[in-house]
Amino acid sequence: MAIGVPRPLALEKPQSVDLAQAARYFGAHGEPDAATLALLQKCAVPLLAAAMPRAVWLLADTPALTEAGLLPGEDVHKHLAGCGQAILLAVTLGPGVDAQIRRAGVGDIAAGVASDALGSALAEQAADAAEAQLRQWAATEGKYLTRRFSPGYGDWDIAVQPLVAAALDTVRKAGLCVTDTNLMTPRKSVTALLGVSDHPVKGQLAGCGHCVLRTRCEYRKRGKTCASE
């Protein structure tokens, strides 16, 4: 059973980095103080200049993804309930962002951490932009999409990353590789799955019970969840 053909998705670089989101990744609680905001603003300029967003996606029947071993666990199937098809998506900011994060951290640990947080925020913005394009495509096809669901959510183990990358041919299509330990390079990259249906669907968040970050989650420490942010 064939999976879909990977297709590139043209992304424009965001005009700015979401500093509020970056501040949360940086560890700020509530509104960042003036010093934190100034540091983020300073580090955002070279980081944004270094970004070269690329994306690739494919459409496949959910049975084909299951047969290919791409959908292990229960939570991802709950997310895809009512969806006969699904989209696999990969987005990366490119190696320049990783290099800029390393440069920023030389002799200035705070700048390195701030740049890392900014990179995470910018990667999410790029993923949001890619998702917005896919939603436009779905609307023209009379289809409905769930929210994004990424490896590592619930019991959808990150060990699936190499299979996702292979299905999307990310090395050739986006310059995105996966290491032997299932980490993505460039680091500031996002992979995700969205359910596709002919009727409105939302998908189901996995919740905290199975999440691999549940013991060290900053949101849970503040009595919140990532879904509430």
Predicted feature residues:
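Long, amphipathic alpha-helical coupling/dimerization segments that relay conformational signals between
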Residues: 105-158
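Active-site helix-to-loop segments that bind/position phosphate- or nucleotide-bearing substrates
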Residues: 1-112
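Short cysteine/histidine-rich metal-coordination sites, predominantly Zn2+-binding motifs
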Residues: 224-229
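Metal/cofactor-centered catalytic core regions of large enzymes
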Residues: 74-78, 215-216, 220
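Short terminal or interdomain "cap/linker" segment that borders an active site or interface and mediates
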Residues: 141-219
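Conserved active-site and cofactor/substrate-binding residues in soluble primary-metabolism enzymes
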Residues: 35-38, 42, 121, 125, ...
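Generic secondary-structure signature for well-ordered alpha-helical cores
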Residues: 45, 49-52, 135, 139, ...
